[in-house]
UniProtKB/Swiss-Prot annotation:
<keyword id="KW-0963">Cytoplasm</keyword>
<comment type="subunit">
    <text>Monomer. Binds 30S ribosomal subunits, but not 50S ribosomal subunits or 70S ribosomes.</text>
</comment>
<dbReference type="InterPro" id="IPR015946">
    <property type="entry name" value="KH_dom-like_a/b"/>
</dbReference>
<protein>
    <recommendedName>
        <fullName>Ribosome-binding factor A</fullName>
    </recommendedName>
</protein>
<dbReference type="GO" id="GO:0005829">
    <property type="term" value="C:cytosol"/>
</dbReference>
<dbReference type="Pfam" id="PF02033">
    <property type="entry name" value="RBFA"/>
</dbReference>
<dbReference type="InterPro" id="IPR023799">
    <property type="entry name" value="RbfA_dom_sf"/>
</dbReference>
<comment type="similarity">
    <text>Belongs to the RbfA family.</text>
</comment>
<dbReference type="InterPro" id="IPR000238">
    <property type="entry name" value="RbfA"/>
</dbReference>
<dbReference type="GO" id="GO:0043024">
    <property type="term" value="F:ribosomal small subunit binding"/>
</dbReference>
<dbReference type="GO" id="GO:0030490">
    <property type="term" value="P:maturation of SSU-rRNA"/>
</dbReference>
<keyword id="KW-0690">Ribosome biogenesis</keyword>
<comment type="function">
    <text>One of several proteins that assist in the late maturation steps of the functional core of the 30S ribosomal subunit. Associates with free 30S ribosomal subunits (but not with 30S subunits that are part of 70S ribosomes or polysomes). Required for efficient processing of 16S rRNA. May interact with the 5'-terminal helix region of 16S rRNA.</text>
</comment>
<feature type="region of interest" description="Disordered">
    <location>
        <begin position="119"/>
        <end position="138"/>
    </location>
</feature>
Amino acid sequence: MSALAYPRVNRLAEEIKKIISHMIRNDLRDPRIAKMTSIIEVNVTRDLRFATIYISVLGDQQEKEETIEGLKKSSGFIRKEVGRQITARFTPELIFKLDESIERGVYMYDVISKVTQKDMDEKKNSDEKRDSDEKLED
């Protein structure tokens, strides 16, 4: 079944996303957590026991790894705060993962652009060669 079939799970995921986003911006003081950290998506299991939080960090690979490490170390505090603010029997265990889909998208765009430019250059060169060959025949 799709996630749309479970509106309670979706509502809980959105609420967790809002709470943790606010905490990252205002409450967490861990210097390892980059200021430019965004929550991309939160997936909560149907039994509401686990929540996977996908984050994006603006920075180099070291900053990304440090941010994930800082969030993992702070997960107990974050979970306690989430549990205080949501109305659920259980507070899901929080699993932080780095979402690299944006970087992959940029990389794929660059690859496609390079291939397209190469094709255009080759077509231009072949057209010029054909034109010069036609002039020589005249």
